[in-house]
């Protein structure tokens, strides 16, 4: 279908010489406005669209009965997209909520849905306690939940899609007294709502202003709350202008739809790098304070305390985690490398204490890492995860490769890592996947394959380091699984360990895994892996914000000037932003050159600059008690992990992984060094 067919005659041209005007029929679009008198239930009025006599592109939206408002709507073509401009003028003081619904003409059951960074397909990988089709097939959400204020509907049958995007400068937000029901805002907000609804079997885009959420609002991890509808004041004589843009196009499949939608969002909102005062050297110097001030000694393992810390004091605890949110070994390697570059004997000594303790006491009887140990409780988690184990091997292979390049060898560590890689071969299923969780005796606890790409990285690194082709063959089998089960089905899920749902990390890890394979292959095989990398990368990109969410005065993140562009939403279940990126910016830089696509490189720079903003240091602690302990759970919408709400952090955080992620972001080309073997000097300006 084309734009004219979609709207059955919506005017798409303003001038005869541009595009021939056609008759507009209102059957495909409906509008309504709700007005609220304080202390009373709101009253909803449907709006009939009547074309103005002297302007075939403009309409008067007439209510079903008299209201103290004048509402007009103008349609215009914007480079093949339909721009909807709504003007609301108050004849008396009013509190209003305006909404429109656009029928796509698609059968709802034939469709998959998209709200970037929050909703993919039907969210059926998510639990019923989070937004998904398990609860309803129609959802409206506030725009700041999304990495772009956009909703898209893709018809698998028609191989067509329609999106609606809000166009605004998004400058205002206001604190509200309630989180459910009908609420009157105490000031101005820029946040509207967007979503999709099943209207008598037809997939419909719904959008409006100010925000509204239905059938539920999602206010806390695994907590659905009653619906909410906000009403904004419009004083007598005031006019408010609202703008949305409709795009429709063809797409071969859901992945192609996501690519189209991301490129459109990127071009529409044009995120620019964030101007921050911190150079790479500044960032690393401050974050190195975490390496010093979080070190825990006196147990069988020496480690940087990086999980479940309180933002209020950042006091170390006895919890040591090899990968995931602790990243003990990767932080030890980063500190080790930095110590040689900067002549920091303190860091060198501390890192070697970590390595020596894990070499002596950090392995189970079967040869796995003791990946999660709580010395405060005297407890060692008996369940292993392919993700933590893989991330531990990854860190130590970086250490061994760096040492080898500098003329130093560690034969005991080499043997431990070779043994672990051999163990991975035993864990791998016939389809190429790895179980998500398992015991020391190899019995499977969680057979989900969503974490499989985390194993690809150390397998390829192990192949390069030990010259053992079995590891490369195993890595290629993981890619076969990724292609068949995740990438080709556009179904990225369950990579993270603190949620079981659609998540950013699954697509990011898939892109990184196939990127590694493309680096060590040639010809058609190289191109195949590169194509898979690009396809997965678009999904990962869709989680990262291309716009700046507004905050209210009094919300700390807004008061210190946080720009959200370049930060990534986490998952459906965990609706906050964070700095999980690791090597992904390097993947984007590589893709940009590989496919001559400047958007990738430009957005990598947006990510790199934006994620420096919350560096805690003296005079600019950003709500964190200690310098260098980078924040984690950054709450940018009406949701929290358990405490504090929008504009603040959760009270507990894990700087172990945030510091490790930013360190890799600021050390570009890390995998290229140890796989394709150019020097680090050639990769860093």
Language model feature labels by segment:
Residues 7-18:
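Hydrophobic h-region of N-terminal signal peptides that target proteins for export
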Residues 24, 38-40, 59-66, 72-236:
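Beta-strand/loop-rich accessory regions of lumenal/periplasmic or secreted enzymes
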Residues 25, 31, 37-42, 47-49, ...:
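Low-complexity, Ser/Thr/Pro/Gly-enriched N-terminal "stalk/linker" regions
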Residues 257-294, 343-361, 405-425, 467-484, ...:
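Extended, well-ordered alpha-helical scaffold segments
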Residues 288-320, 360-382, 424-444, 483-501, ...:
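Glycine- and aromatic-rich loop/turn segments at beta-sheet edges
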Residues 329-345, 391-409, 454-469, 509-525, ...:
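Well-ordered alpha-helical scaffold segments within catalytic/enzyme domains
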Residues 385-389, 446-456, 486-489, 497-511:
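Aromatic-lined, polymer-binding surfaces characteristic
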Residues 671-685:
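Residue-level detector of conserved catalytic or cofactor/ligand-binding positions
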């Amino acid at each position: 279908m084309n734009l004219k067919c979609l709207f059955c005659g919506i005017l798409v041209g303003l001038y005869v010489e541009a595009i021939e005007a056609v008759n507009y029929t209102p059957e495909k679009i409906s509008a309504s406005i709700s007005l609220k008198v304080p202390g009373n239930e709101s009253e909803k009025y449907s709006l009939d669209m009547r074309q103005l006599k002297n302007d075939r592109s403009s309409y008067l939206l007439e209510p079903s009965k008299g209201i103290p408002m004048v509402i007009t709507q103008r349609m215009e073509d914007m480079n093949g997209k339909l721009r909807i401009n709504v003007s609301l003028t108050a004849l008396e003081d009013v509190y209003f909520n305006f909404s429109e619904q656009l029928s796509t003409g698609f059968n709802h059951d034939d469709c998959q849905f998209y709200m970037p960074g929050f909703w993919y397909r039907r969210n059926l990988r998510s639990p019923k306690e989070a937004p998904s089709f398990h609860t309803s097939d129609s959802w409206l959400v506030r725009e700041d939940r999304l990495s772009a204020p956009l909703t898209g509907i893709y018809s698998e049958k028609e191989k067509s899609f329609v999106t609606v995007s809000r166009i605004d400068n998004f400058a205002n937000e206001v604190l509200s007294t309630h989180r459910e029901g009908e609420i009157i805002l105490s000031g101005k907000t820029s946040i509207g709502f967007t979503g999709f609804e099943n209207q008598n079997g037809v997939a419909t885009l719904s959008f409006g202003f100010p925000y509204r959420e239905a059938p539920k609002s999602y206010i806390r991890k695994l907590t659905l709350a009653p619906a909410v509808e906000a009403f904004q004041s419009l004083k007598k004589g005031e006019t408010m202008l609202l703008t949305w843009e409709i795009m429709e196009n063809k797409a071969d499949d859901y992945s192609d739809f996501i690519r189209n939608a991301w490129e459109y969002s990127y071009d529409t909102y044009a995120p620019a790098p964030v101007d921050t005062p911190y150079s790479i050297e500044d960032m690393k110097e401050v974050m190195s304070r975490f390496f010093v001030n979080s070190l825990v000694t006196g147990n069988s393992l020496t480690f940087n305390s990086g999980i479940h810390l309180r933002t209020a004091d950042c006091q170390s605890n006895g919890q040591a985690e090899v990968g995931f949110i602790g990243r003990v070994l990767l932080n030890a390697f980063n500190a080790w490398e930095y110590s040689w570059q900067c002549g920091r004997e303190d860091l060198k000594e501390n890192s070697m204490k970590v390595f020596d303790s894990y070499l002596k006491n950090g392995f189970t009887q079967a040869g796995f890492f003791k990946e999660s140990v709580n010395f405060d409780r005297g407890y060692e988690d008996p369940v292993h995860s392919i993700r933590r184990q893989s991330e531990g091997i990854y860190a130590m292979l970086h250490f061994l490769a760096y040492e080898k390049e500098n003329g130093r060898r560690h034969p005991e560590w080499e043997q431990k890592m070779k043994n672990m890689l051999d163990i991975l071969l035993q864990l791998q299923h016939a389809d190429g996947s790895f179980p998500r969780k398992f015991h020391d005796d190899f019995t499977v606890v969680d057979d989900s394959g969503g974490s499989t790409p985390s194993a690809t990285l150390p397998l390829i690194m192990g192949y390069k380091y030990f010259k053992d082709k079995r590891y490369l063959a195993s890595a290629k089998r993981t890619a076969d699984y990724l292609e068949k089960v995740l990438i080709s089905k556009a179904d990225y899920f369950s990579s993270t360990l603190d949620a079981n749902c659609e998540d950013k990390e699954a697509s990011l890890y898939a892109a990184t895994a196939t990127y590694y394979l493309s680096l060590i292959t040639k010809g058609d095989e190289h191109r195949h892996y590169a194509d898979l990398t690009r396809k997965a990368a678009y999904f990962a990109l869709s989680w990262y914000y291309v716009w700046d969410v507004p905050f209210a005065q009094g919300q700390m993140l807004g008061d210190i000037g946080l720009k959200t562009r370049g930060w990534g939403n986490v998952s459906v279940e965990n609706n906050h932003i964070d700095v999980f990126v690791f090597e992904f910016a390097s993947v984007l830089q590589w893709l940009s050159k590989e496919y001559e696509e400047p958007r990738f490189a430009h957005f990598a720079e947006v990510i790199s600059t934006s994620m420096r903003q919350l560096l805690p240091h003296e005079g600019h602690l950003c709500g964190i008690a200690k310098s260098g302990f980078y924040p984690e759970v950054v709450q940018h919408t009406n949701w929290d992990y358990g405490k504090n709400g929008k504009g603040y952090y959760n009270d507990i955080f894990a700087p172990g992984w945030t510091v490790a992620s930013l360190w890799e972001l600021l050390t570009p080309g890390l995998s290229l060094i140890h796989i394709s073997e150019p020097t680090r000097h050639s990769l860093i300006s």
